[in-house]
């Protein structure tokens, strides 16, 4: 497991393994600059217990509240404990496949087309869809 802090090229905190990486974003899509022990603990626990508590789906199109968020990404199909923290974002991605998915309490994530294809390298800076 590799833990990298914000650098010049990648300004978001992440914990990366062979298959996925987790990043934490504020609600305004700005990266977290001050890495607290809580953030590190949450991300570490998520990395360790990820296969137990979460169900991943390889998807081509992800829709959140009827709005298409991103293509070529992986989305959660279950709730994420981090949504107890208001305005938190979760990044889950295969290598070279990165996306930002806003997760809130009782937020349905609609998944279509269970096909994974190669996508862009950059993390899209998206805003929350209007309610």
From Swiss-Prot:
- Describe the disruption phenotype: Increases sensitivity to copper.
Question: For this UniProt entry, what's an example GO CC term?
Answer: membrane
Q: How does it sit in the bilayer?
A: Multi-pass membrane protein
Keywords from the UniProt entry: Membrane, Transmembrane, Transmembrane helix
Record-annotated membrane-spanning stretches: 35-55, 74-94
Q: Where in the cell is it found?
A: Membrane
Chief subcellular location: membrane
Keyword Heme included in the entry's annotation:
no
> Is Transmembrane helix one of the keywords UniProt gives this record?
yes
Q: Please provide the Gene Ontology terms (biological process) for this protein.
A: copper ion homeostasis
- Name the record gives this protein: Increased copper sensitivity protein 3
Q: Which organism is it from?
A: Saccharomyces cerevisiae (strain ATCC 204508 / S288c) (Baker's yeast)
Lineage, top ranks: Eukaryota, Fungi, Dikarya, Ascomycota, Saccharomycotina
Primary gene name: ICS3
């Amino acid at each position: 497991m590799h833990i990298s802090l914000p650098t010049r090229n990648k300004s978001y905190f992440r914990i990366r393994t062979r298959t996925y990486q987790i990043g934490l974003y504020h609600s305004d899509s700005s990266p977290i600059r001050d890495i607290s022990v809580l953030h590190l603990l949450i991300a570490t626990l998520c990395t360790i217990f990820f296969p137990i508590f979460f169900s991943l789906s390889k998807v081509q199109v992800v829709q959140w509240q009827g709005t298409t968020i991103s293509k070529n990404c992986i989305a959660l199909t279950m709730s994420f404990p981090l949504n107890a923290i208001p305005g938190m974002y979760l990044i889950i991605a295969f290598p070279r496949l990165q996306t930002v998915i806003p997760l809130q309490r009782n937020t349905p994530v609609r998944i279509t087309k269970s096909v994974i294809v190669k996508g862009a390298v950059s993390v899209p800076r998206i805003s929350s869809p209007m309610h």
